[in-house]
């Protein structure tokens, strides 16, 4: 863990803790961290703001280029184009993409990106137009500048900032247990804070559409036996179905998806 400054990056201060999350879309550790970030967002929503940045390192961008045949199936450019329709939708898009490429070990295709774009509530035609804009490359350069200023060398990496823009941020590289991140948030807030409860299991799966067992265990902290029992109930009610992939079991919602705001 290291202290990093954002004073030279020309970023405006906010009234809550800002967390910069640098991720590699092909990294299983980044995929696992997304469950932890979802839990943080649920429990500490009024205290934190999370900004996801695709780590624009040469290694990551080379992987994005190697997986693509055009701009359309280049996940780095696709993510930046998705961001133009809102960060929440862009984060939803990348979560759906990771659900496709990590557990299934799939190659990225145009049809996969189209499906994830639409499931994230993003206008597909506008997205296609945005993909042709040169400003996407400029946006990646800005992300690269931010990553260099914060000395990001690996993904996942999180950088925590308090509301004082002149204070140094705390950089956390790699993947840690959930309580490490909650400890940092509580220390930065400097006062007792109340946690929110997670939504009903059914609601969460409906929101996410596809979830891992590990993700649900992280969010709800139930005994695995109890969680399996509740999942089977939802499966019997035809609300979810179990999918088996090389990297483990997933649960997919059969309920109408909740539209992104």
Swiss-Prot record:
It comes from the Bacteria. SUPFAM superfamilies: Thioredoxin-like. Adapter protein required for efficient degradation of Spx by ClpXP under non-stress conditions. Interaction with Spx stabilizes Spx and exposes the C-terminus of Spx for recognition and proteolysis by ClpXP. This is ClpXP adapter protein SpxH. InterPro entries: Adapter_SpxH (IPR046404), Thioredoxin-like_sf (IPR036249). Disulfide bonds: none annotated. Its main location: cytoplasm. Coiled coil: none annotated. Transmembrane segments: none annotated. Keywords: Cytoplasm.
């Amino acid at each position: 863990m290291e202290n990093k400054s954002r004073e030279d990056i020309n970023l405006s201060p906010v009234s809550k803790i800002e967390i910069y999350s640098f991720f590699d879309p092909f990294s299983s550790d980044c995929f696992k961290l997304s469950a932890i970030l979802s839990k943080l967002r649920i429990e500490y929503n009024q205290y934190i703001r999370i900004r996801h940045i695709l780590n624009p390192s040469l290694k990551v961008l080379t992987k994005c280029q190697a997986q693509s045949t055009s701009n359309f199936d280049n996940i780095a450019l696709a993510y930046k184009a998705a961001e133009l329709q809102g960060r929440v939708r862009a984060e939803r898009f990348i979560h759906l993409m990771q659900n496709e490429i990590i557990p299934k070990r799939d190659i990225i295709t145009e049809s996969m990106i189209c499906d994830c774009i639409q499931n994230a509530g993003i206008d597909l035609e506008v997205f296609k137009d945005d993909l042709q804009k040169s400003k996407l490359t400029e946006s990646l350069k800005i992300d690269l500048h931010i990553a260099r200023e914060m000395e990001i060398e690996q993904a996942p990496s999180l950088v925590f900032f308090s509301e004082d823009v002149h204070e140094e941020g705390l950089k956390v590289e790699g993947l840690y247990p959930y309580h490490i991140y909650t400890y940092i948030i509580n220390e930065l807030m400097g006062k007792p804070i109340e946690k929110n409860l997670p939504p009903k299991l059914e609601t969460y799966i409906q929101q996410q559409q596809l979830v891992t067992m590990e993700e649900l265990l992280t969010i709800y902290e139930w005994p695995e036996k109890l969680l399996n029992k509740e999942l089977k109930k939802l499966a019997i009610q035809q609300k979810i179905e179990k999918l088996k992939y090389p990297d483990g079991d997933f649960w997919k919602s059969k309920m109408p998806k909740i539209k992104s705001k």
